[in-house]
Amino acid sequence: MAVLKWKQHRFSTSDDTVSATQLVKQLQHTPSPYSSTVSVGTAKTYGQTSAATRPGHCGLAEKQHCGPVNPLLGAATPTGNNKRRKLCSGNTTPIIHLKGDRNSLKCLRYRLRKHSDHYRDISSTWHWTGAGNEKTGILTVTYHSETQRTKFLNTVAIPDSVQILVGYMTM
């Protein structure tokens, strides 16, 4: 009878020994499709909280946590009243995408330097790959708050040839 030895580097510094027959019996057991792990070896418990009570990034338990947010509910506008979006927006930031001719966007980005106090960051010109308009580019502008974004849109002159897309981005 063969004996298998391994070391669990993460949780223990001691060796666990399991016989080959015990190992085969445990591996032959077919777990249910909803089982997340199959344990082989000695039973150990670790001080982990269940997924149902583990807090999400915004302090809610996973069962209470927000699902996908529907942008049609008004969260994409500064006057939106989607409370779920605001509650779970710990790592989201207000943004706008400026969409238009690549060269025009490049020139616009350089002109926006003088308004740097009205935004947080601005990306270089980028584009989606795949089927689409190869001459269209996008600039992403991020803000510290919705108020700053509103002030930017009211202050800065954006050319009519550039489309403005307002939204949020998870950082």
Swiss-Prot record:
Cellular component GO terms held in the UniProt record: host cell nucleus
Domain of life: Viruses
Pfam family, one: PPV_E2_C
Gene3D superfamilies xrefs: 3.30.70.330
Keyword RNA-binding recorded: no
Protein name: Protein E8^E2C
Entry's Gene Ontology molecular function annotations: DNA binding; DNA-binding transcription factor activity
Compartments reported by the entry: Host nucleus
Keywords from the named record: Host nucleus
InterPro entries: E2/EBNA1_C_sf (IPR035975), Nucleotide-bd_a/b_plait_sf (IPR012677), Papillomavirus_E2_C (IPR000427)
GO biological process: regulation of DNA replication
Purpose of the protein: Plays a role in limiting the replication of viral DNA in keratinocytes. Recruits the host NCoR/SMRT complex to viral replication foci to mediate repression of both viral replication and transcription.
Family: Belongs to the papillomaviridae E8^E2C protein family.
